[in-house]
Amino acid sequence: MSIRIIPQDELGSSEKRTADMIPPLLFPRLKNVYNRRAERLRELAENNPLGDYLRFAALIAHAQEVVLYDHPLEMDLTARIKEANDQGKPPLDIHVLPRDKHWQKLLHSLIAELKPEMSGPALAVIENLEKASEQELEQMASALFASDFASVSSDKAPFIWAALSLYWAQMASLIPGKARAEYGEARQYCPVCGSMPVSSMVQIGTTQGLRYLHCNLCETEWHVVRVKCSNCEQSRDLHYWSLENEQAAVKAESCGDCGTYLKILYQEKDPKVEAVADDLASLVLDARMEQEGFARSSINPFLFPGEGE
């Protein structure tokens, strides 16, 4: 079953009520998203062997929060929603949507915000990005969207992605429409932009007990039922792995049918879990899953595959 975004004026009253019962899609609410992520990264850095890198990621997340409010985006997406709905495509499809120069403006603002905090190799990386031409930056963005990770060094990718993510999240938060669940293609990719998830989360609150996958680009969350592989939709050979115990807040859901896994976070076990931060902080679990022969079906925005991986 797939998820489509329908223009507001094309939804009947019964569909509006149905969409409000179990929301198939949660558009990003950007207030404090990046600050909360930065705080969680710093918290998880304590007594973690990856502490230095988690603190580095926290700096980027905090810079995203600052740049978000310094450079708000105004855009009317009504026509885009109608066009995408007619085509049956995600409205902000990363493979077809033309990129505005706004994202490069965001990148340079991120660099300016981060330079005083960086030193050594990290400073050299952002200085190289600062000197890159518009064409070079567009080529790197296109390569990342095409999963051509060998064309973008893994030290540059998080900065490029941070700017692209800000741009796409700003657009996603402006979408004037409702989501409708339909039978069709699977839900392994974001219904808003077509990117990958970073992890999934079993939520609390108004969506108590429901699992939502979290987009690694536009910050949208979409519903996928529990005890079903988010990659191939099979349910007969699923297993759950953790480094702690049955009550662990972070587990990996593996599928024997397609040979992949995705992290699943439980807010009821720890209300502070965060889709990006807790995924990044549990790389030891990723190593265990690789030892067991499973491939990751997601990408963390702070950790891209390098050349040859």
Curated annotation (Swiss-Prot):
It comes from the Bacteria. The keyword Signal does not apply. One of its GO terms (cellular component) is cytosol. Keywords: Cytoplasm. Its main location: cytoplasm. It holds the Pfam family FdhE_central. GO terms for molecular function: ferric iron binding. One of its GO terms (biological process) is protein maturation. Belongs to the FdhE family. NCBIfam families: FdhE, PRK03564.1. Necessary for formate dehydrogenase activity. This is Protein FdhE. It comes from Salmonella typhimurium (strain LT2 / SGSC1412 / ATCC 700720).
